[in-house]
From Swiss-Prot:
Annotated region described as G1 motif, given as residue ranges: 41-54
Region (G5 motif): 329-334
Protein name: Guanine nucleotide-binding protein subunit alpha-11
Gene Ontology BP annotations: action potential; adenylate cyclase-modulating G protein-coupled receptor signaling pathway; cellular response to pH; cranial skeletal system development; developmental pigmentation; endothelin receptor signaling pathway; G protein-coupled receptor signaling pathway; heart development
Catalytic reaction(s) noted: GTP + H2O = GDP + phosphate + H(+)
Membrane topology according to the record: Lipid-anchor
Origin species: Rattus norvegicus
Gene that this polypeptide is encoded by: Gna11
Length: 359
């Protein structure tokens, strides 16, 4: 073989190898592009306690592995802590609101509960069970509970406090509903990916309290949809961080900011008006017009109230071409969320698959 033919042979091998490598790179780039298309990022936003974390739990139940017995057991301590936190809040409010206990022994029970360091609670001992049950049955405490908009109390307080006997049993294992009702403030960012119809939905939950919001900024890239939660029942409540600011006004201000962000010009917006069950209960004795004087609908009418609240939020949208998709929800009701998210999923897929030419 001549030198020239040897060089030509080597060169052709190099060219072949170079082509093979290029083909591999092209293939990987196509794969990466396809995978990026297959992942949709859903950003879950809303003020503190609007129901975002509960919504994520529902996604795990409906579209993920759910909660095993071992997972549920991991919530036991948190259920106990939620009960103590709730009763401590009520006991403190009894003093602040100057409400008297009907039963004399409840002064001692209140003192016993106040002295508990909630973060160290891991069990539910007999003396505390009795103290909490006796306190909860006191007409003074019930009067205080009826005035709960005047202090900070978790929405799940009544759910747990009326079921102390079940929770106090030996070998107690939290139910799925117990898990959904547990309140643990979200600090930092929680991501929950789940696979639906060969597309990964990556749901991102960020803390709703003001102090948490500065951590949101890096979540804003490549967001497919904004899912914004509003607690319908917060129309008469004040912020945890500021006791002279209305929670719903804060929610409106945040929503206005979010929908006008340049980052989100190409993201669809889905508005969940959550806690519709709590609104139905509250509207019977707390009048919307007292907090939003522009409301001119009938009193004690949950339908009129929620339609008014929906309009308040939709009217914040300055872009007439941008559709805001809205749903009334109860995040603790698995069947309601299953139904609503099926509709939401279809909306998101239709909007995005067109964009990616996948339909």
């Amino acid at each position: 073989m001549t030198l020239e033919s040897m060089i030509a042979c080597c060169l052709s091998d190099e060219v072949k190898e170079s082509k093979r490598i290029n083909a591999e790179i092209e293939k990987q780039l196509r794969r990466d592009k396809r995978d990026a298309r297959r992942e949709l990022k859903l950003l879950l936003l809303g003020t503190g306690e609007s129901g975002k974390s509960t919504f994520i739990k529902q996604m795990r139940i409906i579209h993920g592995a759910g909660y095993s017995e071992e997972d549920k057991r991991g919530f036991t301590k948190l259920v106990y802590q939620n009960i103590f936190t709730a009763m401590q809040a009520v006991v403190r409010a009894m003093d602040t609101l100057k409400i008297r206990y009907k039963y004399e022994q409840n002064k001692a029970n209140a003192l016993l509960i106040r002295e508990v360091d909630v973060e160290k609670v891991t069990t539910f001992e007999h003396q505390y069970v009795n103290a909490i049950k006796t306190l909860w049955s006191d007409p003074g405490v019930q009067e205080c509970y009826d005035r709960r908009r005047e202090f900070q109390l978790s929405d799940s307080a009544k759910y747990y406090l009326t079921d102390v006997d079940r929770i106090a049993t030996v070998g107690y294992l939290p139910t799925q509903q117990d898990v959904l009702r547990v309140r643990v403030p979200t600090t930092g960012i929680i991501e929950y990916p789940f696979d639906l119809e060969n597309i990964i939905f990556r749901m991102v939950d960020v803390g709703g309290q003001r102090s948490e919001r500065r951590k949101w900024i890096h979540c804003f890239e490549n967001v497919t949809s904004i899912m914004f939660l509003v607690a319908l029942s917060e129309y008469d409540q004040v912020l945890v961080e500021s006791d002279n600011e209305n929670r719903m006004e804060e929610s409106k201000a945040l929503f206005r900011t979010i929908i006008t962000y340049p980052w989100f010009q190409h993201s669809s917006v889905i508005l969940f008006l959550n806690k519709k069950d709590l609104l139905e209960d509250k509207i019977l004795h707390s009048h919307l017009v007292d907090y939003f004087p522009e409301f001119d609908g009938p009193q004690r009418d949950a339908q009129a109230a929620r339609e008014f609240i929906l309009k308040m939020f939709v009217d914040l949208n300055p872009d007439s071409d941008k559709i805001i998709y809205s749903h009334f929800t109860c995040a603790t009701d698995t069947e309601n969320i299953r139904f609503v998210f099926a509709a939401v999923k279809d909306t998101i897929l239709q909007l995005n698959l067109k964009e990616y030419n996948l339909v």
